[in-house]
């Protein structure tokens, strides 16, 4: 898995970028959100997801980890492939998408090209609890920096646990139990170790 690519921005297009890393150009598909974040930077660091099919290996890129996390949530839902997930993230930024899911706004999600009523309902059904939980964590401005740090570490720990063989459901449950009501700051290593002890 290629976690991120850092290098010179050789080409930028609303649907893809080319990043030059020591003379090798990586073609990376991006959303409009990421495209707008890159602006005209000379050097970029893009978080990536490598999608492997029999006939193609495709890199998808994200300006930040929140967008990558939303992409992975979307592609975990039946009927939504990487291409459709990118269209969703081009239609609204990650925060807008989280809010639409949390308030169960079927109409907004269904307005995205390629998303029908049943798929929009499935997105809400499968992700609403997670989005509402995130919204509570980020509830007040005074806790905002803490929640961003918490969510970032949680996201990285979740990826690590899945790589170690946990199902996503079990990994999320363990992490939420550890973090619930605990105001102490965790290091990524501590969080993973505690989750492993719960298996």
From Swiss-Prot:
Positions of transmembrane segments: none
Annotated GO MF terms: ATP binding; four-way junction DNA binding; four-way junction helicase activity
Region (Domain II): 64-142
Keyword DNA repair belongs to the record: yes
GO cellular component, one term: Holliday junction resolvase complex
Annotated CDD domains: UBA_RuvA_C
Region (Flexible linker): 143-151
Domain of life: Bacteria
Domain remarks: Has three domains with a flexible linker between the domains II and III and assumes an 'L' shape. Domain III is highly mobile and contacts RuvB.
Phylogenetic placement of the source organism: Bacteria, Pseudomonadati, Bacteroidota, Cytophagia, Cytophagales
Keyword Cytoplasm appears in the UniProt entry: yes
Quaternary structure (record): Homotetramer. Forms an RuvA(8)-RuvB(12)-Holliday junction (HJ) complex. HJ DNA is sandwiched between 2 RuvA tetramers; dsDNA enters through RuvA and exits via RuvB. An RuvB hexamer assembles on each DNA strand where it exits the tetramer. Each RuvB hexamer is contacted by two RuvA subunits (via domain III) on 2 adjacent RuvB subunits; this complex drives branch migration. In the full resolvosome a probable DNA-RuvA(4)-RuvB(12)-RuvC(2) complex forms which resolves the HJ.
Subcellular location: Cytoplasm
Annotated family: Belongs to the RuvA family.
Keywords: Cytoplasm, DNA damage, DNA recombination, DNA repair, DNA-binding
GO BP field: DNA recombination; DNA repair
Region (Domain III): 151-199
Name the UniProt record assigns to this protein: Holliday junction branch migration complex subunit RuvA
Function text: The RuvA-RuvB-RuvC complex processes Holliday junction (HJ) DNA during genetic recombination and DNA repair, while the RuvA-RuvB complex plays an important role in the rescue of blocked DNA replication forks via replication fork reversal (RFR). RuvA specifically binds to HJ cruciform DNA, conferring on it an open structure. The RuvB hexamer acts as an ATP-dependent pump, pulling dsDNA into and through the RuvAB complex. HJ branch migration allows RuvC to scan DNA until it finds its consensus sequence, where it cleaves and resolves the cruciform DNA.
Pfam families, sorted: HHH_5 (PF14520), RuvA_C (PF07499), RuvA_N (PF01330)
Protein's organism: Cytophaga hutchinsonii (strain ATCC 33406 / DSM 1761 / CIP 103989 / NBRC 15051 / NCIMB 9469 / D465)
Region (Domain I) location: 1-63
């Amino acid at each position: 898995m290629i976690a991120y690519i850092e290098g010179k921005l050789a080409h930028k297009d609303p649907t893809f970028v080319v990043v030059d890393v020591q003379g090798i150009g990586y073609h990376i598909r991006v959303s409009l959100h990421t495209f707008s974040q890159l602006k005209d930077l000379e050097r970029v660091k893009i978080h990536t997801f490598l999608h492997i099919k029999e006939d193609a290996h495709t890199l998808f890129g994200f300006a930040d980890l929140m967008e990558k996390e939303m992409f992975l949530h979307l592609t975990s839902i039946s009927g939504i492939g990487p291409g459709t997930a990118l269209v969703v993230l081009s239609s609204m930024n990650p925060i807008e998408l989280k809010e639409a899911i949390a308030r169960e706004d079927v109409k907004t999600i269904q307005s995205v090209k390629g998303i029908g009523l049943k798929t929009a309902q499935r997105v809400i059904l499968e992700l609403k609890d997670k989005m509402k939980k995130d919204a509570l964590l980020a509830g007040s401005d005074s806790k905002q920096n803490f929640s961003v740090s918490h969510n970032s570490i949680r996201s990285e720990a979740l990826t690590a646990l899945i790589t170690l063989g946990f199902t996503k459901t079990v990994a999320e449950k363990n992490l939420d139990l550890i973090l619930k009501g605990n105001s102490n700051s965790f290091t990524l290593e501590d969080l993973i170790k505690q989750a492993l002890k719960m298996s």
